[in-house]
Amino acid sequence: MQTIAAIAKLEEILTNNGISAQQALALLTTALPLATTSDPQEPLPPLLRALQTASDRLRQQQVGDTVTYVINRNINFTNICEQHCAFCAFRRDATASDAYWLNIETILSKVAEAVAQGATEICMQGGLNPAAKEGGSSLRYYQFLVREIKTAFPQIHLHAFSPQEIQFIAREDGCSYAQVIAALHEVGVDSMPGTAAEVLVDAVRSKICPEKIRTATWLEIVETAHRLGVWTTSTMLCGHIETPADQMAHLQHLQQLQQKALEHDYPARITEFILLPYVGELAPKAMRQWVGHHQPRLLPTLVLTAVARLFLGQWIVNHQPSWVKLGLRGATMALNWGCNDLGGTLMEEHITSVAGAQGGTGVSPEDLVAAIHSLGRTPQQRTTLYNPVGERQ
């Protein structure tokens, strides 16, 4: 405990602009069990209070008191998927009665609605549908989607297609990751979601998403995107079967990825880190049995949020909670544990909501602004790449 107490000293953390991987693991190993047995409504135990204070002060030191958000729309264009991830309640076989695959007219209508509501970003991802081809080519189909959207709405920032989707397209068409990313970037993909990361530890992936790309492939695709000038986000799926050591291995991979982008002076890098707590109310039975709880545990999520700021903050300065998974109240609490961004309005969300999330599928800019004001912070609308939109509010 003496080591943990030393780590928790606010002065040490602020002087060093963060903590080492060894210190972070020691904190997680001690703080997570404490958080699991503590009542979030009661006063925090001293260690958790010190952790919260340190992460909040480091956030203020690194990015200030402005809290950002983006007006965007999420479009999941198909739930047809060839994979069977243990945590996923979204995917369907093509023959399922509730399988869907949006046509381009519907997609463009959704984009038009978003633009009319002030959206600057469309986030678009979908299941891995082998039938999604244009002239026998997966890449041409994805290019068609992008080209149609950007032709009709050239002003919109298109944040689209995860590393898993990039690998899927490359496999289907027999081309390299670089060729796929470059071709999509050329027709209008502006940035890439850092999803499909789950936990970047193959022992975990082999159990919860055995058909997904391995850790090395995810890292290779994201680094390739940075090298080609495509910015990405980064994520972690937490609160299921992973251990504190797994969590730290994941954070170290992200830190090393960002460090490499900076050292090699790549034209793009990681814009933000988003912690995604597991929601499994309607997930497949095996995963629910492994995990033993169906909704996010708020205090352990906040502890990991804080440690992510302390370890990653000097490399990835923008940290975002998931209001879809935590609810807006929980996400607002995370702004006191190291986060400085509340994410997007989304307007619709299907992947988490069908798993039983209780946070909703869309939130208004006014609700985000009110949540930020409730903490005495200053709201600022932003672009996907964290440039300000309009005046501070």
UniProtKB/Swiss-Prot annotation:
Record-linked InterPro entries: Aldolase_TIM, CofH/MnqC-like_C, CofH_family, F420, FO_synthase_su2, rSAM
Coiled-coil regions, chain positions: none
Cofactor note: Binds 1 [4Fe-4S] cluster. The cluster is coordinated with 3 cysteines and an exchangeable S-adenosyl-L-methionine.
GO molecular function: 4 iron, 4 sulfur cluster binding; 5-amino-6-(D-ribitylamino)uracil--L-tyrosine 4-hydroxyphenyl transferase activity; 7,8-didemethyl-8-hydroxy-5-deazariboflavin synthase activity; iron ion binding
Pfam families: CofH_C (PF19288), Radical_SAM (PF04055)
EC number(s) recorded for this UniProt protein: 2.5.1.147
Domain Radical SAM core: 67-322
Kinase as UniProt keyword: no
Domain of life of the source: Bacteria
Pathway in which the depicted protein is active: Cofactor biosynthesis; coenzyme F0 biosynthesis
Cofactors named for this entry: [4Fe-4S] cluster
Catalyzed chemical reaction(s): 5-amino-6-(D-ribitylamino)uracil + L-tyrosine + S-adenosyl-L-methionine = 5-amino-5-(4-hydroxybenzyl)-6-(D-ribitylimino)-5,6-dihydrouracil + 2-iminoacetate + 5'-deoxyadenosine + L-methionine + H(+)
UniProt KW keywords: 4Fe-4S, Iron, Iron-sulfur, Metal-binding, S-adenosyl-L-methionine, Transferase
Binding-site residues for [4Fe-4S] cluster, renumbered to this chain: 81, 85, 88
Keyword S-adenosyl-L-methionine part of the UniProt annotation: yes
Family per record: Belongs to the radical SAM superfamily. CofH family.
Alphabetized HAMAP family for the sequence: FO_synth_sub2
Function: Catalyzes the radical-mediated synthesis of 5-amino-5-(4-hydroxybenzyl)-6-(D-ribitylimino)-5,6-dihydrouracil from 5-amino-6-(D-ribitylamino)uracil and L-tyrosine.
Subunit structure, as described in the record: Consists of two subunits, CofG and CofH.
Protein name: 5-amino-6-(D-ribitylamino)uracil--L-tyrosine 4-hydroxyphenyl transferase
Species assigned in the record: Thermosynechococcus vestitus (strain NIES-2133 / IAM M-273 / BP-1)
Organism lineage: Bacteria, Bacillati, Cyanobacteriota, Cyanophyceae, Acaryochloridales
Gene responsible for this protein: cofH
